[in-house]
Regions:
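Catalytic cores of soluble metabolic enzymes centered on carboxylation/carboxyl-transfer
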Residues: 241, 280-479
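N-terminal beta-alpha lobe that positions the nucleotide/phosphoryl donor
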Residues: 1-256, 260-276
Length: 479
């Protein structure tokens, strides 16, 4: 996105990411957090400020990872005079606290899931909430995101352990063990709405995404638009998202997340004040580059200016269907255990209607245990949902990734499942369909051949015996 608008790009990288693609693709790249661990290096806000000062940086984009919702980064950018490409500081603070976010949604008149009025600090409070609202309930981290710090509780017997696990996970992931409670809805769809707002008071939605294919509250496959929901319900959800964000004068890209139930009702979950991993499917069906739009909004443009060219809400239409699959170095047959190692071979899919957003996906890349296991995002577009599925299946089958395990066979099973085809799946889809984890035996001929060539190159032909030179009788030639 920065290259498209002719912006000089300065990247940061940790010692462990020395060979990463983003370091080599940027115009300039500098080591951050020298002497610190792989995570702490990227969280070193003061060192980021130093690099920005020393290398004439004008603006900082937080990405969608470590610091994407960190209000301290936005605050330091303002103090140092750097443009923060994202929401205002107040919005990061407002929506970073999930209880505060619920309050804002309530003020906007958005339907809410029954929940605790504030944080809970004892098992007794959780028991009281369960007695009032009934099981199942869900425990959530106040500062949470990405499915971490969340535990569903189905009975009193599970309550104490779930409470302890949620608090410890929240503390480890977010630096705070504050939690709150919500009633757990059975078999909903996870629907989110992409919002764009500028500094001129304009706020629009770019329609919705269906993110219901998930495991342990972490998304695996995303679809846009949410074609399986009635159009009237989709419109109501999008209008509610815009209403909430207009109420707080939101700026930049953001996502409002909801649960939609089988009775065609919907309920607010949270706001993510950042760009999200799955923004690609929205870009494909609307033709709007969301990250590039963020950059231009930060420069002061209106979303309706020619430089951005987003039309009025009534003229923002969708065209076709898009699917995103997150290809990860995880082993679905082993409880999605992350795998590490070196990619000894890598070949990606491609073709018309296929988009790849790569991480460190290349032959020779070393997959470490330090960061997220996402290897590459594959997004396909088609005039219909079925066409998008067909293109994705072809794309996945064209991939050749050797050296580490991946979830590609699992993704193929998801795409071919009847519930995914007709859109009738819910957030329980993966849990309820154990057949998704039945995989055909792979021949893996490529890896076997590579291993064989490497072995004989180093060790010789150990399986071929060396015979003594044969002796032949003198040849009698006729005279």
């Amino acid at each position: 996105a920065a290259s498209d608008v002719y912006k000089r790009q300065v990247a940061i990288y940790s010692k462990e990411d020395t060979l990463s693609l983003h370091r080599n693709r940027a115009d300039e790249a500098y080591l951050v957090g020298e002497g610190k661990g792989p995570i702490d290096a990227y969280l070193d806000i003061e060192d980021i400020m130093r690099i920005a000062r020393e290398h004439d940086v004008d603006a900082i984009h937080p990405g969608y990872g470590f610091l994407s919702e960190n209000s301290q980064l936005a605050k330091r950018c303002a103090e140092e005079g750097f443009i923060f490409i994202g929401p205002r500081l107040e919005h990061l603070i407002m929506f970073g606290d999930k209880i505060n976010a619920r309050t804002q949604a309530e003020l906007a008149g958005i339907p809410m899931i029954p929940g605790s009025t504030g944080t809970v600090s004892s098992v007794e409070e959780v028991r009281a909430f369960a007695d009032k609202h009934g099981f199942p309930i869900i425990i959530k981290a106040v500062n949470g995101g990405g499915g971490r710090g969340m535990r569903m509780v189905a009975s009193m017997g599970e309550l104490e352990q779930a409470y302890s696990l949620a608090k410890s996970e929240a503390l480890k992931a977010f630096g705070s063990d504050d939690i709150y409670l919500e009633k757990y809805l059975q078999n909903p769809k996870h629907i989110e709405v992409q919002i764009i707002g500028d500094t001129h008071g304009n706020i629009v939605h770019l329609h919705e995404r269906d993110c219901s294919v998930q495991r342990r509250h972490q998304k695996l496959v995303e679809v846009a638009p949410a074609f399986s929901l009635p159009q009237q319900l989709r419109s109501r959800i999008c209008e509610a998202a815009v209403k909430l964000m207009k109420n707080v004068d939101y700026i930049s890209a953001g996502t409002v997340e909801f649960l939609a139930t089988p009775d065609n009702n919907f309920y607010f979950i949270e706001v993510n004040p950042r760009i999200q991993v799955e923004h690609t499917v929205t870009e494909e069906i609307t033709g709007i580059d969301i990250v590039q739009t963020q950059i231009k909004i930060a420069e002061g443009y209106s979303i309706h200016d020619p430089e951005i060219a987003i039309p009025e809400q009534k003229d923002i239409i969708t065209h076709g269907h898009a699917i995103q699959c997150r290809i990860t170095t995880e082993d679905p047959a082993n409880n999605f255990m992350p795998d590490t190692g070196k990619l000894i071979a890598y070949r990606s899919g491609g073709g018309f209607g296929v988009r790849l957003d790569g991480g460190n996906a290349f032959t020779g890349s070393v997959i470490t245990p330090y960061y997220d296991s996402l290897l590459v995002k594959a997004t396909t577009w088609g005039l219909t949902h079925q066409i998008a599925i067909s293109k994705m299946l072809r794309c996945l089958k064209e991939f050749r990734i050797r050296g580490v395990k991946t979830n590609i066979l699992f993704l193929e099973n998801v795409l071919q499942h009847p519930q995914f085809t007709d859109g009738s799946y819910s957030t329980k889809f993966v849990d309820d369909n154990t057949d998704l984890f039945i995989f055909p035996k792979t021949h893996d001929r490529g890896t076997k051949l590579l291993n064989y060539i490497a072995d004989i190159s180093i060790n010789g032909y150990s399986n071929v015996g060396v015979q003594p030179k044969p002796e032949f009788a003198p040849l009698n030639m006729p005279k």
